[in-house]
Amino acid sequence: DELFEDLTVNFSNTGYSYLALLKKGSDLAKENNLEGSLEVFYQLKESSDGFFGNNLINDIARTNIARISIALGLFEDALSALEKYSNDEDAYTHELKGDALSGVGSNELAIQQYQSAIDKYTDNGLKNLVELKINNLETNE
């Protein structure tokens, strides 16, 4: 833990630090320590953000923040993590936005995001899963 702290504090803007944070956040999530994992992914997002940051790592951090926040019922936090993404993003981002919007009760907007996900997914199994989410929202209206 001491080496981890040294790496992630003193060398926070390096690829090694990013990978260490990514690994730790993933390990904590696997151990079902979602709050701890969320904290690590926020640290990763902050250190990889900005002009000299790393866009790929930042996107991974934001996606994980959104996933974990949704699992914890923190739907507004999930939306905040995803707010930088426009409508030209990948299918999974649209699905996450739909999940978060559904969680805050914005069902019409959630359905729009789910529809965008279906349009962009190439895997029929994933399309069917998102269709179920839409059907569930329409049934509950």
Specify the residue positions occupied by each region the protein language model found:
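Short solvent-exposed coil/turn linkers within tandem alpha-helical repeat scaffolds
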Residues: 9-17, 46-58, 84-93, 119-128
